[in-house]
């Protein structure tokens, strides 16, 4: 059998090794100048005013909710079709996640679903830019402004995603991920951008023990001796080892995403003749980052279930992913919200399958996936 083709593989090279070597030889391996450079680079990429690097996007979500003073008695609107960490962070703050349905074919929340879920207790809205495509963020942000509700963009899939000519995170508050499967990675890491100076100040304190300064003060080359804890905080800072890798990856972003786009186009052309349904593209002007390529496997239409397809591909040496099992079907949330029904979310959660997609894939790799899908579709 051919070598196993994973669902994802990070695109690392000699440049990343050199970046890590430089940090190790510098003598400063934790939060330092590489973090500052990464934050500046993301301000330049997005056009936003402030950037705060953190140890993960989950950590970023946690302290963003804290900075917005979201807690007991508050409600936060979010899709159920998202990684469960968002729901977990809302719940750990003592707030209530209000899960709404998604569009059946883009798998993103709609402004209409969000607005219908607003109550006097709604404190925040968390739309997800899903799979590398942008949600209709102008319309969602307008709802937030109309009701006085904060919008936190889950941009974990959206490094390199553009909406109506502007990079995701150009204004407001957005959270990016550098997890191992993301479009740029440093193994683990995340970053928040915001145009709110007060939120930025709170985030910098909360990510590092509640201190009023960073781990690395860029003026005095070391933390000032008079630094004080201004509020209880966490240990969510990003090391310079990770930041250096992320910076190197960011310099390659256009190349990495171009290759993702080429593979996605190869899949799209082949799937036109197959019963497996890819996601629809958003109607608004955008640039897709192609973080994921997802098909829906409906047994009645395809002659095979999603789970059986994934197992059959595995037997052929091809890895797949599931993004995501609906959060409200997980045990904890199923028991907490037993009557919640989200038809589009549930239909997709039972059928979605993420195909291999990463920059180092070859055309032959994609052809191998396509051939397997053709065989499993009986063609």
Curated annotation (Swiss-Prot):
Known EC number: 2.6.1.87
Catalytic activity: UDP-4-amino-4-deoxy-beta-L-arabinose + 2-oxoglutarate = UDP-beta-L-threo-pentopyranos-4-ulose + L-glutamate
Principal EC category: transferase
GO molecular function: pyridoxal phosphate binding; UDP-4-amino-4-deoxy-L-arabinose aminotransferase
SUPFAM superfamilies: PLP-dependent transferases
CDD domains per UniProt: AHBA_syn
Modified residues (N6-(pyridoxal phosphate)lysine): 182
Coiled coil region boundaries: none
Pfam families: DegT_DnrJ_EryC1 (PF01041)
Pathway: Nucleotide-sugar biosynthesis; UDP-4-deoxy-4-formamido-beta-L-arabinose biosynthesis; UDP-4-deoxy-4-formamido-beta-L-arabinose from UDP-alpha-D-glucuronate: step 2/3; Bacterial outer membrane biogenesis; lipopolysaccharide biosynthesis
Presence of keyword Transferase: yes
InterPro entries linked to this entry: ArnB_NH2Trfase, DegT/StrS_aminotransferase, PyrdxlP-dep_Trfase, PyrdxlP-dep_Trfase_major, PyrdxlP-dep_Trfase_small
Protein's GO biological process: lipid A biosynthetic process; lipopolysaccharide biosynthetic process; response to antibiotic
Cofactor field: pyridoxal 5'-phosphate
GO CC terms in record: membrane
Record-linked Gene3D superfamilies: Aspartate Aminotransferase, domain 1, Type I PLP-dependent aspartate aminotransferase-like (Major domain)
Keyword match Lipid biosynthesis: yes
Sorted UniProt keywords: Aminotransferase, Antibiotic resistance, Lipid A biosynthesis, Lipid biosynthesis, Lipid metabolism, Lipopolysaccharide biosynthesis, Pyridoxal phosphate, Transferase
Subunit structure: Homodimer.
HAMAP family tied to this protein: ArnB_transfer (MF_01167)
Functional description taken from the UniProt entry: Catalyzes the conversion of UDP-4-keto-arabinose (UDP-Ara4O) to UDP-4-amino-4-deoxy-L-arabinose (UDP-L-Ara4N). The modified arabinose is attached to lipid A and is required for resistance to polymyxin and cationic antimicrobial peptides.
Family membership: Belongs to the DegT/DnrJ/EryC1 family. ArnB subfamily.
Protein name: UDP-4-amino-4-deoxy-L-arabinose--oxoglutarate aminotransferase
Species of the source: Escherichia coli O157:H7
Recorded name of the encoding gene: arnB
């Amino acid at each position: 059998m051919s070598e196993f083709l994973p669902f994802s593989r990070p695109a690392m090279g000699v440049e990343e090794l050199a970046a890590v070597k430089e940090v190790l030889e510098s003598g400063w391996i934790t939060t330092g100048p590489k973090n500052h450079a990464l934050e500046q680079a993301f301000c330049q990429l997005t056009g936003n005013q402030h950037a705060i690097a953190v140890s993960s996007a989950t950590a970023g979500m946690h302290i963003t909710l804290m900075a917005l003073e979201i807690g007991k008695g508050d409600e936060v609107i979010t899709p159920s079709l998202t990684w469960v960490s968002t729901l977990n962070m809302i719940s750990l703050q003592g707030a209530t996640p209000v899960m709404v349905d998604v569009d059946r074919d883009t798998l993103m929340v709609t402004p209409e679903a969000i607005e219908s879920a607003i109550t006097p207790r709604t404190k925040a809205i968390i739309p997800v830019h899903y799979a590398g495509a942008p949600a209709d963020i102008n319309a969602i942000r307008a709802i937030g402004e109309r009701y006085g509700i904060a919008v936190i963009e889950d941009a974990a899939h959206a490094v390199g995603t553009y909406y109506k000519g502007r990079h995701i995170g150009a204004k407001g508050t957005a959270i990016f991920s550098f997890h191992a499967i993301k479009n740029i990675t440093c193994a683990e890491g995340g970053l928040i951008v915001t145009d709110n100076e007060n939120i930025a100040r709170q985030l910098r304190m909360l990510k590092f023990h509640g201190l009023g300064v960073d781990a690395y003060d860029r003026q005095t080359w070391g933390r000032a001796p008079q630094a004080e804890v201004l509020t209880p905080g966490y240990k969510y800072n990003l090391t310079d080892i990770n930041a250096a890798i992320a910076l190197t990856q960011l310099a390659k972003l256009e190349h990495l995403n171009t290759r993702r786009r080429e593979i996605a186009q190869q899949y799209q052309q082949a799937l036109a003749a197959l019963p497996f349904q890819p996601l629809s593209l958003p109607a608004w002007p955008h640039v897709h980052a192609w973080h994921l390529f997802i098909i829906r496997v409906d047994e009645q239409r395809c002659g095979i279930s999603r789970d059986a397809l994934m197992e059959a591909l595995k037997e052929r040496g091809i890895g797949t992913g599931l993004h995501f099992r609906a959060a409200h079907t997980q045990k904890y949330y199923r028991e907490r919200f037993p009557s919640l029904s989200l038809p589009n979310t549930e239909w997709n959660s039972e059928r979605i399958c993420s195909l291999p997609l990463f920059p180092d894939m070859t055309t032959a790799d994609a052809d191998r996936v396509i051939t397997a899908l053709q065989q499993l579709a009986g063609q």
